[in-house]
Design a protein with these regions (language model features):
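DUTPase catalytic domain/fold
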Residues: 1-143
Length: 143
């Protein structure tokens, strides 16, 4: 099991918890109360800085209930936090766009992350044909 260093920006932040067997994703919460109006953009502080192990990155995504509960969208789809973002002041944040007026309470679980190994080194080879069947285009299962 890997040990990950986490700096909390407040003593009353709920500590991160990995629940084996339940999900590979770890919830993150708003570090402060945030009030947004429809059309607002804001970087919501998540109250943690994390020293990822070398060779790893984190993928940050909204929880499935985030839009239903708060009407916010994560503006960069899935956020990617790389290994080098590990300083004492490198607090993780969730970039959001508000679709309606909302107040997100401090401690509300709004997003989740997982840690994944970096992509291996790749080399691309130019070819005239790939050799596989066409599936029918973008958005098609090929059926």
């Amino acid at each position: 099991m890997e040990t990950i260093k986490v700096k909390y920006f407040s003593d009353d932040m709920e500590e991160l918890c990995y629940v084996a067997g339940k999900s590979d994703w770890i919830d993150l919460s708003a570090a402060e109360e945030v009030t947004l109006h429809a059309g607002d953009f804001q970087l919501i502080p998540l109250g943690v800085a994390i020293a990822l192990p070398e060779g790893y990155e984190a993928h940050l995504a909204p929880r499935s209930s985030t839009f239903k509960n708060f009407g916010i969208l994560q503006t960069n789809s899935v956020g990617v936090v790389d290994y080098s973002y590990r300083g004492d002041g490198d607090q993780w944040r969730m970039p959001v766009y508000a679709m309606r007026d909302v107040t997100i309470p401090k401690g509300a679980r709004i997003c989740q992350f997982r840690i994944v190994e970096n992509q291996p080194a790749l080399q691309f080879l130019k070819v005239e044909t790939l050799g596989g069947p066409d599936r029918g285009g973008f958005g098609s299962t090929g059926i």
